[in-house]
Structure formats: C-alpha cells, structure tokens
C-alpha cells in the first residue's frame, strides 16, 4: 500500500523501498554487473539489486511520462496540420554535492536508451556553465563555486531553451574536474535527442529564489520531469570527505590536477581540509540554495547508508 499521511496534506505519494520495487513490473534489467560498475561514482556502492529495485521502476515511470508527452505532441500536430518539430523530453536531476546525482544520471541514460521507443538519450551537466576560473577569480567568487552567482545562467537558460525549441544542433560547454575549470573550446554537440538529462545543483531554482528579479526565466521552466536525490546532511558530509580521500589517492595524484598538492597531505590533514571545504562551501550551498528547491521536484529519492535509496516520493 502507498503510505498516506492522514494528519498532513502532501502533494506527494510516498513509497518505501519494497513498495517502489514492486512497481518494476517485470521490466528486464539490460545492464550487466560490469556495466553498472563503470556507471557508478568513485564513492558509491551500486549493486544489481539497487538498479533492479530502484532505477528500473523509475525508468518504467519515465517511459510512461515520455510516451504520454509524445502523444500530446502528436495531438497538437494533428490539430495544427503540421509535421511538427522533434522536441526532446528534458529530465532534471538535482541534489547536493556527493549525493550521487551523476551516477543517477548515467544510470537513467543507460536504462532509458534501452527502451525501444527512445534510443537517443543525451546527458549534460550544468558544471560546464560555471564561469571560467579567470572570471570567478576576478569577481572574488572562487570560494562560491557551485553557488548560483558562479554560473553563467544566461548561457545555461539559452541552451535549454534552444533544446526545447527543437533546434537541430546546440552546443554546451564541458567542465573538467581534473583542471577544476571549463575546458576551452571543449563544447559538446547536442543534436535533437529524444531525451536530454540535465544534471546539476541548480536545475530546480525558480523565481522564488530571486524575489528581486521575479520575471527572470529559469532552467526549471524547461524541465519536463525533475528528480531530487536526497540524503541526511551528516551522510552527505561523510560521503564528501570519503570521496575527497579517494581522489587524494587517485585523481589528485595526477600532476595536471588542480588539487595535486592535496595528494601529498597526511590523511588527518586531508580530512580537516575536506571538512572545512564542506562547512564553508558545500554545506552552506546546500542549506542556502539547494535544499530549499527539494519540494519542487517531481520525484524525491532519499538515500540512507551506502547510497541505498530507502524511500521515494512521487508528486501526485
């Protein structure tokens, strides 16, 4: 049974893990264990069971929504007597740093690509629309990286607007976590996919976040279905620190890495720095700008230890 809170009206239906898993309804798992290992993040435990119980039901739900949207487009074309343009279905994925947004996005890209109705699924992260480090330094915003003011929101909104307008070819800038900066001339080309997955901290922001400029257009205005990946902050901080330590042993050891100096730190000092980065930047951004957007999502998936999703809330 779906949980219904009798004492408090809510716009969401709530499912525990078992209830949600039952909604898979015989959808086959088309990914192998080796493929799943390639898709998961550096700090996540992702099992075949997790994919089958959580992400297959989600891909089934999204397939229903996307098919419904295609039928609506066909009705409009019939009414207008036109062939119409191919308009991608945009899925937004939001949540804190270290919560596993990228893994969720990559998994959905792989699963949705396997549905026969829509094979073309593109994935874009909003990191590419951060201002280059040169600009952030000039504006004194390097310690606000990931905050709303650190993004080129005009370019991001323009990109999503062009995609939803049916433009045949749209380019998006690419971000490198190795150099901690936007890649010069590293654009990714998007050519009318069936589905565009847009993953980032800020995809659910709206005019409510900018009362001084309520008439601004936002990314969320162009998103058809949005997912917020949630977890308690103490888990998020722990995941962030563990990820930092793994990067210190791996990616940071690359001489080209922006954080190469961190690879030489003793572990206690590395933990202190990661904790400081969380408290002064990522945790602050979560509380001020990311968490307040959670209840705007079409679906909220809440994680417990080991990145296992323990419940799902679906907007009615």
Swiss-Prot record:
<dbReference type="InterPro" id="IPR027417">
    <property type="entry name" value="P-loop_NTPase"/>
</dbReference>
<comment type="pathway">
    <text>Cofactor biosynthesis; coenzyme A biosynthesis; CoA from (R)-pantothenate: step 1/5.</text>
</comment>
<keyword id="KW-0808">Transferase</keyword>
<keyword id="KW-0418">Kinase</keyword>
<dbReference type="Pfam" id="PF00485">
    <property type="entry name" value="PRK"/>
</dbReference>
<dbReference type="InterPro" id="IPR004566">
    <property type="entry name" value="PanK"/>
</dbReference>
<dbReference type="InterPro" id="IPR006083">
    <property type="entry name" value="PRK/URK"/>
</dbReference>
<dbReference type="GO" id="GO:0015937">
    <property type="term" value="P:coenzyme A biosynthetic process"/>
</dbReference>
<keyword id="KW-0067">ATP-binding</keyword>
<keyword id="KW-0173">Coenzyme A biosynthesis</keyword>
<keyword id="KW-0547">Nucleotide-binding</keyword>
<dbReference type="GO" id="GO:0004594">
    <property type="term" value="F:pantothenate kinase activity"/>
</dbReference>
<protein>
    <recommendedName>
        <fullName>Pantothenate kinase</fullName>
        <ecNumber>2.7.1.33</ecNumber>
    </recommendedName>
</protein>
<dbReference type="GO" id="GO:0005737">
    <property type="term" value="C:cytoplasm"/>
</dbReference>
<keyword id="KW-0963">Cytoplasm</keyword>
<dbReference type="GO" id="GO:0005524">
    <property type="term" value="F:ATP binding"/>
</dbReference>
<comment type="similarity">
    <text>Belongs to the prokaryotic pantothenate kinase family.</text>
</comment>
<feature type="binding site">
    <location>
        <begin position="95"/>
        <end position="102"/>
    </location>
    <ligand>
        <name>ATP</name>
    </ligand>
</feature>
């Amino acid at each position: 049974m779906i949980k219904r809170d009798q004492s408090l009206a809510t716009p969401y239906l709530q499912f525990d893990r078992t209830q949600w898993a039952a909604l898979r309804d015989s959808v086959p798992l088309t990914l192998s264990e080796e493929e799943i290992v390639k898709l998961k993040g550096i700090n996540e435990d992702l099992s075949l069971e997790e994919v089958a119980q959580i992400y297959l039901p989600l891909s089934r739900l999204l397939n229903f929504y996307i098919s419904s949207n295609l039928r609506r487009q066909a009705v409009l074309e019939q009414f207008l007597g036109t062939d119409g343009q191919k308009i991608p279905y945009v899925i937004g994925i939001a949540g804190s740093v270290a919560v596993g947004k990228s893994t969720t996005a990559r998994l959905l890209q792989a699963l949705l690509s396997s549905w026969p109705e829509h094979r073309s699924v593109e994935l874009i992260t909003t990191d590419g629309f951060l201002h280059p480090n040169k600009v952030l330094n000039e504006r004194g915003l390097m310690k606000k990286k990931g905050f709303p003011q650190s993004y080129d929101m005009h370019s991001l909104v323009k990109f999503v607007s062009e995609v939803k307008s049916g433009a045949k070819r749209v380019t998006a800038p690419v971000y490198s976590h190795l150099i901690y900066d936007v890649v010069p001339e590293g654009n990714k080309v998007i050519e009318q996919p069936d589905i565009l997955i847009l993953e980032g901290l800020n995809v659910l922001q709206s005019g409510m976040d900018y009362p001084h400029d309520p008439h601004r257009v936002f990314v969320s205005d162009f998103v058809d279905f949005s997912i917020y990946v949630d977890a308690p902050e103490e888990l998020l901080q722990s995941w962030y620190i563990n990820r930092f330590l793994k990067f210190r042993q791996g990616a940071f050891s690359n001489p080209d890495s922006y954080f190469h100096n961190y690879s030489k730190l003793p572990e206690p000092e590395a933990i202190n720095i990661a904790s400081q980065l969380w408290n002064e930047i990522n945790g602050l951004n979560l509380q001020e700008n990311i968490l307040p957007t959670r209840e705007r999502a079409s679906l909220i998936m809440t994680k417990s230890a080991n990145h296992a999703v323990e419940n799902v809330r679906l907007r009615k």
